[in-house]
Amino acid sequence: VVVPRDYELLVPREWFRVDLMRDRWRSHLKTFVDRQSEGRHVSAELKRDVWTTLRNTAEAGRARGAMEFFLLTTSQDGGLPASLLVSLLPLGDTPADPEKYAAWLELREPEGPGRRRVSVVELTAGPAVRVLGATTLNVHVLMPGRAGYLTLSFSSPLIGMAGPMERLCDAIAGSLRWVV
């Protein structure tokens, strides 16, 4: 099995893309925050808080193999946008079998009403572990050649991960294709 050299992902045009592999990613992120607040009554404090949260998310993601960060404005008041962080997770101690990985993740989920639902799904790109929470959806897609997992981390802090947003995120994940 050939290890892919890249991937293709269909993300709607309304989502703002930040390439975390380039040095100028901070300026692109700043551009998004500025555009999101343009023509709206957004306080300087909220704008600064959104910038700080997104920057911290991008920096933490880069430290864990994130390559792309997509953002979608979901409110008129300039609050936190919906986002998609695309990361490469080398196998390391992570089980290469999606069923075993799902079981491993399930064991780490705390009991209670906030417990995320873990399942294994089959995408066009291959088997994937799907982890659904109230405001997040993580899809870990096993790469051909067992090179690792490509992780799609969706977050929708304002409107939640249900209904149309969940279906949109599933459709984006379902569009994943490998480039060999």
Describe the residue ranges of each PLM region:
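N-terminal targeting sequences that direct proteins away from the cytosol to non-cytosolic compartments
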Residues: 1-180
